[in-house]
From Swiss-Prot:
The gene is recR. GO terms for molecular function: DNA binding; zinc ion binding. Pfam families: RecR_HhH, Toprim_4. This is Recombination protein RecR. PANTHER family: RECOMBINATION PROTEIN RECR. A zinc finger (C4-type) spans 58-73.
Length: 206
C-alpha cells in the first residue's frame, strides 16, 4: 500500500536531515499528520520559509545573518585582532555557548574531504586573504577528525603563503579534544581548556 504523494514527499524530505532514516522520517510525518491543532504545522512551515528567505552568509566571515554583516563582525566590543577559523556555523554556536572566546570567526563552509570530492577550492579560503591586514592572531579550530586535521594543515599553509607580517601568531586548539569527536559533543570545560592552552602552529620547520 502506498501513501499519498504528499505524504511520501514529506517522508523523503525528512530523510534529507542528518541522522534521520526512513523510519524516523515516517514517525515525524505521521506525528504532524495526527496533530489536531494544524497551527503547529503552519508555525513550523512559517519558520522554515523565513529560514529560506531571510538567512544568508555574512559578507566578511561567512556566518549566518539576516543582514549583509553578521552580529560578530559588526560588534565593536569583540576583539577584531583575533580570528578563529572553523568548519561551519554550528562550530560557532558551540564556542559562543561557553562565552569564553570574544574574537571574530571565519567559516570555511566544511572540511577538506577528498573521499567526498570536497577540495580546498570548494571552501571559503579566498575571502580570508582580505582579513589578514589588522590581525594579530589566527586560531585554527577544526575538529580532531582526519578531515579536520587535513583542513588544519592546509589552513596553516594557506596562511603562511599570504601573511606578510611574521609577528602574526597562528595557533591551534590544544590537544585533549578526543580524536574523531565533533565540538558539539564536548563539554564547556574541555572547550575552554582547548582555547586557553592553544599551541603555536606555524610550521613543521619552525
Amino acid at each position: 500500500m502506498k501513501n499519498s504523494p504528499t505524504v511520501e514527499k514529506l517522508i523523503e524530505s525528512f530523510t534529507l536531515l542528518p541522522g534521520v532514516g526512513k523510519k524516523t522520517a515516517e514517525r515525524y510525518t505521521f506525528f504532524l499528520i495526527n496533530q489536531k491543532n494544524k497551527n503547529k504545522i503552519l508555525y513550523l512551515s512559517k519558520h522554515l520559509k523565513e529560514l529560506v528567505n531571510n538567512i544568508k552568509s555574512c559578507n566578511i566571515c561567512g556566518y549566518i545573518t539576516e543582514k549583509n554583516i553578521c552580529n560578530f563582525c559588526s560588534d565593536s566590543q569583540r576583539d577584531h585582532s583575533t580570528i578563529m577559523i572553523v568548519a561551519d556555523n554550528r562550530d560557532v554556536y558551540c564556542f559562543e555557548k561557553i562565552n569564553h572566546y570574544h574574537g571574530l570567526y571565519h567559516i570555511l563552509g566544511g572540511l577538506i574531504d577528498f573521499s567526498r570530492c570536497i577540495k580546498p577550492e570548494n571552501l571559503n579560503f579566498n575571502s580570508l586573504k582580505d582579513r589578514l591586514k589588522t590581525i594579530k592572531e589566527i586560531i585554527i579550530a577544526t575538529n580532531s577528525t582526519l578531515e579536520g586535521e587535513i583542513t588544519a594543515t592546509y589552513s596553516k599553509k594557506f596562511l603562511k603563503k599570504y601573511l606578510k607580517d611574521e609577528k602574526i601568531k597562528i595557533t591551534k586548539l590544544a590537544y585533549g579534544i578526543p580524536i574523531g569527536l565533533d565540538f558539539n559533543y564536548l563539554d564547556e570545560k574541555t572547550l575552554c581548556n582547548a582555547i586557553n592552552n592553544r599551541n603555536n602552529f606555524k610550521g613543521e620547520n619552525e
